[in-house]
UniProtKB/Swiss-Prot annotation:
GO MF, any single term: 4 iron, 4 sulfur cluster binding
Protein name: Probable RNA methyltransferase Lcho_2507
Cofactor: binding details: Binds 1 [4Fe-4S] cluster. The cluster is coordinated with 3 cysteines and an exchangeable S-adenosyl-L-methionine.
Organism: Leptothrix cholodnii (strain ATCC 51168 / LMG 8142 / SP-6) (Leptothrix discophora (strain SP-6))
Positions with a binding annotation for S-adenosyl-L-methionine: 151-152, 181, 204-206, 280
Any one Gene Ontology cellular component term annotated for this protein: cytoplasm
Protein keywords: 4Fe-4S, Cytoplasm, Disulfide bond, Iron, Iron-sulfur, Metal-binding, Methyltransferase, S-adenosyl-L-methionine, Transferase
Gene Ontology BP terms: rRNA base methylation; tRNA methylation
Similarity section: Belongs to the radical SAM superfamily. RlmN family.
Pfam family, one: Radical_SAM
Residues at the catalytic site: 89 (proton acceptor), 323 (s-methylcysteine intermediate)
Disulfide bonds: 99-323
């Protein structure tokens, strides 16, 4: 379901634009309706009031909590059931953040990701994306939404941008706290600067080598990492938001000295931060995370070379909070490790 469908349904009952906006604000922000200025009886026409119970029931059915798995780090992994019975994952993050899904499945096929193993099943509508935020807000405060769950937002651009515009206005989330995460797609760099709400941009880089990136992200657009960084830098300068480059650390694959040199070459002097996240190990996949000590040494080396680097723990590591693990692990066939020449670890 798209947000515009909700508006059309309200208009069909005689709601004016001011009524639509107040109803949608109450829903998106999870505002109380008993007492105060938000009581529907005080501002809605009778026909709209009569239609509200059915509408609210349908909105509640857009995203229902099937299971919740708290993590020791303050995160919580949510398995969310959509109205048609399909499931996606959301992750409540420490410090008032939420990671939402934009597709059921994913077509990019990252070799280290569970979600991509089942392919793309369907798009998640803009109202379903917002419904994940509403579901989370009923449990805790949400001030930041990252579009970094199941799916590639660039492959569902209309719904994702509609949800971003809605959350950045009616949903009362600061524009810099809406983070569009992508593997990189020319359409993203064309579309994001045009919207009324311009989100922060996170770019899944993972390697500076075009050949290796093609192996790790086999169905991502064939854009050279240098071209990706150039386009992202233009967006960063236009919006005054630094680009968040995402780097999943895979032991023996993208954690060697050659990548250090590549990162310095691409990112030195750029308006950016490099987020290095040790791989959230999946039992069914043949990849491992480097030790925390090795990852920290890598981050320190990059700091010394002038790259703003943050080493992060993957949220929900103890509850398998990585993208698609809960939903996809029993559906996917066994994986085969790609043949990549190992590189020496940093001294």
């Amino acid at each position: 379901m798209r947000i515009d469908f909700i508006r059309q349904r309200l208009r069909a009952q005689g709601a004016k634009p001011c009524h639509e906006q107040r109803i949608l604000r109450i829903w998106a922000q999870v505002l109380p309706t008993e007492g105060g200025r938000s009581r529907p009886d005080d501002f809605l026409p009778q026909a709209v009031r009569d239609a509200m119970p059915a509408l609210l029931a349908d909105l509640d059915g857009l995203a229902r909590l099937r299971s919740q798995h708290p993590g020791e780090d303050g995160s919580a992994r949510l398995l969310v059931e959509l109205a048609d019975g399909q499931t996606v994952e959301s992750v409540l993050l420490p410090r008032d953040g939420l990671c939402v899904s934009t597709q059921v499945g994913c077509a990019v096929g990252c070799v280290f990701c569970m979600t991509g193993r089942e392919g793309l099943l369907r798009q998640v509508g803009s109202a379903e994306i917002v419904a994940q935020v509403v579901l989370a807000r009923r449990q805790r405060l949400v001030k930041k939404v990252v579009f970094m769950g199941m799916g590639e937002p660039a492959h569902n651009l209309d719904n994702v941008m509609e949800a971003i515009d809605f959350l950045g206005t009616t949903g009362a989330i600061g524009h810099k706290n809406l983070v569009f995460s992508t593997v990189g797609d020319p359409r993203v760099f064309e579309r994001l600067p045009l919207g009324p709400v311009k989100p922060a941009l996170a770019l899944s880089l993972h390697t500076t080598r075009a050949d290796l990136r093609a192996q790790l992200l086999p169905r991502a657009p064939r854009m050279d990492p240098a071209d990706l960084v150039e386009r992202a830098e233009a967006y960063a300068r236009a919006t005054s938001y630094p680009i968040q480059y995402q780097w999943t650390l895979l032991e023996g694959i993208n954690d060697g000295p050659d990548e250090v040199e590549g990162i310095v070459r691409l990112l030195h002097g750029k308006y950016a931060v490099l987020n290095m996240i040790p791989y959230n190990t999946v039992p069914d996949l043949p990849y491992t995370r480097p030790s925390w000590e090795a990852a920290a040494a890598l981050a320190r080396t990059l700091h010394r070379r002038g790259i703003l680097t943050k080493l992060r723990q993957s949220a929900g590591q103890d509850v398998e909070g990585g993208c698609g693990q809960l939903r996809a692990r029993e559906l996917a066939p066994s994986a085969r490790r790609i043949e990549i020449r190992p590189v020496a670890s940093l001294p």
